[in-house]
């Protein structure tokens, strides 16, 4: 791995992300000798606010059956005792400097951030470098935090109808790939992790060569690169990063499951269709289809199922783009006395209609206007800019983001129809119904 980095010409590589007419801010990027990629996105807004992020290229996608949820557990452990910090001291230091911090674990990556004033840049870098190299893994802290995670699993998944339905959906939709479980993991795995399991996961994946340091906001790139060199350049890598080799087999038929759960007499439906990687050219059209079907009260499914037929109390549709095969998801909650099968029948009817009849140009224009507005809004704060850019850098390809506006502008009604025909295929659908 290091031989590869030695071939890279070191130094600042200024990457302009502004194509003609683009509203994306510019970014600058540098790769340190140990492989850590440092990205700076100055916003020039004189806000004196920055967000310092460390993205690790590891999520539940990198776990194995029997050890699910470890990436999320490590996120919890990462704020415990280190060589130079007591448990809780990280949070206290951030609080004392007037900042806020948090973390999240997804299917594809883990994100840590500190939002602070610009003058606290170096302290934020120092804190994150400490977590990367000096976490101590004390058994008593591990045991108590495991209990916290188990309670989170109960609260967000087992005892919440929507959370449980979502978890069981992925259990059904993916049979081989680690997307088979959501980042919280299975309860039996949570109960049976060892401290060494979590420590080994940290040693394997929390390495400079597997991380992105990203700072956005009112900041000078030179200060970030200088600070990154000071605090991170001497952290050594410990070994090769294992590649995810599992690929979900092509789905060769309908998958359906029925779940018994106390839902208060209300029936729930979730339906999904496999989609390609986040890098695929069809992603913009899939996002638009999500807006057409479920993006707001005037979208097709809410207007038909909720307003006209009064079958559902809520219905949504959206596209999940991931490193490997993603998912286009539709979720509906029935009104009292309405069966999930009735919801399913009407949803499939509307999908087939979309595939047979192109949406109007006026509908597409409205989607483009709303999407552009949301996109511009996402570039207003250091936090949202970091989240947007970081989600592409950490998954290994920034180009889909750089091309996004151009691809949205060129999107036409026939493309939407063709992409709907290509992916919203009934005999490749996964459907779960939950009822008492």
Question: How would you label these PLM feature ranges?
Answer:
Residues 28-29, 37-43, 199-204, 253-261, ...:
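Short, surface-exposed beta-strand/loop micro-motifs that present aromatic residues
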Residues 31, 91-240, 277, 308-309, ...:
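Charge-rich, well-structured scaffold segments of protease-associated domains
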Residues 1-7:
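Positively charged n-region of N-terminal signal peptides that target proteins for export
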Residues 9-17:
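Bacterial N-terminal signal peptides
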Residues 19-21:
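Boundary at the C-terminal end of the N-terminal hydrophobic targeting segment
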Residues 51-114, 181-183, 295-311:
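M16/MPP (pitrilysin/insulinase) zinc-metallopeptidase core fold and M16-derived inactive scaffolds
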Residues 171, 240-300:
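His/Glu-based metal-binding/catalytic segments typifying zinc-dependent metallopeptidases
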Residues 23-53:
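Mature N-terminal segment immediately following signal peptide/propeptide cleavage
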